[in-house]
């Protein structure tokens, strides 16, 4: 039996948020893998929204398999909606075949006596599902559950809420499905196979987009020092603070000129705040000085916060908004003609109340309102400069307006971004901290990457707004440079040119790009292509330059070495490809026999051995693996680690790959031989593609000092 466990999806009210794409993906994955049941451990909504609840329940019911659902604390945030939400909660005891799932409703950190009574009847085939870790429940309830746990250590207890995953004994913390909040790794769902008694994760994979690096930049709190850093690291996007105008004009101009000469493309200047007091807008002298400085620098972009005026003030007197936008429009006309203006969202502070006395611009619709009002009066383009930290550190509004909601509602208007991490420190939540991991504790950038790849977010400058004058942004730049330098590759994929493939090359390539693949080889079957070889080769060759700014595209071909599928007398028909993959070499009927190297030399191009245990091949033919692999390396032959796990292959894994990853001696032999190892997902359906497995294998090879086959194709 296969059971799917999920938690912490946090569906918001906006159905265009990326969380709904995760739900669609999860349901599709559950169907493809023929799961027997689905169990959801709470927080299916962000704040108990009725419409989000209905959408979730409809999707789960449409699976047509047993489902167990419990609420989490987020589902109970809107008091008036709690009765509606809880009508969909499963009973305490749920039978799934010969297994039992005890559904513990601990959404308010308490557990009913009825539930404790059910817990006393558990056996080896029982799963206990709850939302919170039991140690975090209210005092006496936690003590009572811990006592029960001591008596039943063999029962599996699964929970969510932490947004991070771990397994200790039979306690299982489930990874969040929400790409806004999944900690430490990508959002995922978790399957449990009752036959093997193993958990396996399926990831909603959100890698760093291949094309984001040219948009990355820094906010300069120490302009001279920071611009020197930009020169050294090829940073093409720069934001200066308004205080930069205090630097000698000739000095700052020379620095900007040098930066542009070195490839700088987008210079932004952050504006002073806009105030309204005593019937007057802003500081006229300050603003005029800012506009003059922006024009002098020939800025490509300026950013400004929403007006520092209360919601109540603007609602009571609409003329104030008119005065503010008139004030700004009059000055923005003096900016360079192509200069873009980005309106930035703000956030709740300890001084604010969550009512109309707070500052305007804490929620998406207010930012959009101001942007559109200003845009109607300006000749310059007006958009949104979306600050992710401000959107996240915005309680209580962050519960309703999740990051995914901000992206869905304002993404099409964005002209830039401020990215940073929010950290919970001794003084409370702190913004503008370095991003030291992509999937952080308070902000996971998985949803940002997913939105970027899906076109929900416009491609625009991504500024790391890390405050400090001593290069506090450097760890963040280093983190992204590490990912930029990863040359993740996949040399085994199929299109509709193969009989077993289904998708057009364009769709296959787009899938690889969205999965963060840098070098991608399409390698359709020789026998499937048939007499269309020139058509196939021409098509892939024509597509390569079209996608060259996002991915390096190779055209390979996969050869079955069975005599009925390949004519060994015409090897020249393979010469024009970038490489070939060879399969069936262990088959006694095959054309290779014990002379793989000679066979490969006929094609006069790089050859790789696909989905084959080369140690077994050496054993079969009496070769010393180290010597044979060394000889293969001399001929630029490579060996594939096939990481396929898809519907075409029945979701089975190659044993030789798992064995290699666990066998240090085999790794040593390959490492010493200098043999290049390739990674191939062997994809036949785009919806099956699992980029996480490709990245995982690439990282494994690099971490173990094993040569990778991408090196054979990088000039």
Predicted regions and their residues:
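Histidine-acidic metal/acid-base catalytic patches
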Residues: 207-213, 224-231, 291-300, 311-316, ...
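Extended substrate/RNA-proximal surfaces in nucleic-acid metabolism proteins
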Residues: 289-304, 312-331, 354-374, 526-641, ...
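Conserved beta-sheet core of the metallophosphoesterase superfamily
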Residues: 62, 68, 138-200, 661-665, ...
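His/acidic metal-ligating clusters that form di-metal
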Residues: 26-37, 100, 110-170
């Amino acid at each position: 039996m296969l059971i799917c466990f999920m938690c912490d999806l946090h569906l918001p009210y906006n159905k265009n948020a990326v969380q709904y794409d995760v739900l669609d993906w999860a349901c599709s994955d559950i169907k493809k893998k023929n799961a027997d049941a689905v169990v959801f451990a709470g927080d299916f909504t962000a704040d108990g929204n009725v419409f989000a609840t209905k959408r979730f329940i409809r999707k789960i019911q449409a699976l047509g398999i047993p489902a167990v659902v419990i609420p989490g604390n987020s589902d109970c945030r809107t008091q008036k909606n709690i009765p509606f939400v809880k009508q969909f909660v499963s009973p305490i005891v749920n039978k799934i075949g010969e297994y039992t799932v005890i559904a513990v409703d601990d959404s308010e950190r308490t557990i009913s006596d009825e539930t404790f009574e059910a817990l006393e009847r558990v056996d080896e085939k029982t799963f206990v599902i709850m939302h919170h870790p039991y140690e975090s429940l209210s005092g006496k309830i936690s003590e009572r559950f811990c006592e029960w746990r001591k008596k039943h250590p063999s029962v599996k207890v699964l929970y969510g809420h932490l947004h991070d995953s771990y397994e200790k004994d039979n306690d299982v913390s489930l990874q969040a499905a929400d790409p806004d909040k999944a900690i430490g790794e990508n959002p995922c769902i978790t399957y449990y196979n009752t036959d093997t008694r193993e958990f396996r994760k399926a990831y909603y994979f959100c890698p760093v987009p291949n094309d984001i690096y040219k948009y990355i930049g820094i906010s300069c709190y120490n302009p001279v020092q920071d611009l020197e850093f930009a020169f050294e690291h090829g940073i093409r996007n720069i934001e200066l603070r308004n205080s930069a105008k205090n630097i000698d004009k000739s000095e700052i101009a020379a620095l900007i000129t040098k930066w542009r000469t070195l490839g700088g493309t987008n210079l932004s200047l952050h504006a002073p705040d806009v105030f309204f007091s005593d019937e007057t807008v802003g500081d006229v002298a300050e603003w005029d000085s800012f506009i003059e400085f922006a024009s002098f620098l020939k800025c490509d972009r300026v950013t400004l916060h929403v007006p520092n005026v209360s919601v109540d003030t603007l609602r009571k007197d609409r003329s104030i908004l008119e005065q503010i936008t008139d004030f700004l429009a009059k000055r923005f006309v003096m900016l360079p003609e192509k200069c873009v203006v980005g309106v930035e969202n703000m956030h709740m502070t300890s001084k604010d109340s969550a009512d109309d006395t707070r500052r305007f611009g804490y929620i998406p619709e207010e930012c959009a309102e101001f942007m559109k009002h200003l845009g109607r009066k300006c000749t310059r383009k007006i958009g949104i400069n979306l600050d992710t930290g401000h959107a996240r550190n915005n309680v209580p509004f962050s519960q309703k307006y999740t990051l995914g909601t901000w992206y869905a509602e304002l993404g099409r208007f964005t002209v830039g971004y401020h990215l940073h991490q929010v950290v919970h420190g001794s003084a409370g939540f702190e913004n503008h901290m370095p991003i030291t991991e992509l999937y952080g504790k308070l902000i996971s950038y998985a949803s940002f990457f997913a939105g970027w790849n899906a076109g929900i977010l416009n491609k625009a400058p991504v500024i790391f707004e890390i405050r400090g004058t001593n290069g506090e942004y450097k760890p963040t730049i280093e983190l992204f440079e590490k990912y930029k330098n990863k040359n993740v590759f996949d040399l085994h994929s199929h299109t509709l040119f193969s009989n077993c493939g289904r998708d057009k090359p364009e769709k296959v390539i787009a899938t690889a790009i969205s999965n963060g693949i840098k070098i991608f080889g399409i390698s359709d079957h020789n026998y499937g292509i048939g007499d269309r070889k020139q058509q196939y080769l021409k098509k892939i060759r024509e597509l390569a330059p079209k996608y060259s700014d996002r991915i390096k595209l190779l055209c390979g071909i996969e050869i079955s070495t069975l005599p009925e599928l390949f004519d060994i007398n015409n090897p020249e028909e393979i010469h024009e490809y970038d490489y070939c993959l060879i399969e069936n070499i262990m088959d006694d009927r095959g054309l290779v026999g014990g002379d793989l190297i000679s066979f490969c030399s006929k094609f006069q191009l790089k050859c790789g051995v696909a989905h084959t245990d080369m140690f077994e091949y050496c054993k079969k033919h009496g070769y010393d693996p180290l010597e044979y692999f060394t000889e293969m390396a001399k001929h630029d032959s490579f060996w594939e680690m096939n990481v396929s796990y898809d519907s075409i292959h029945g979701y089975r894994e190659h044993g030789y790959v798992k064995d290699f990853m666990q066998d240090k001696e085999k790794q040593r032999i390959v490492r010493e031989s200098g043999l290049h190892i390739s990674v191939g997902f062997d994809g036949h359906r785009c919806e099956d593609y699992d980029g996480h497995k490709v990245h995982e294998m690439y990282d494994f090879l690099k971490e173990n000092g094993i040569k990778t086959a991408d090196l054979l194709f990088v000039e």
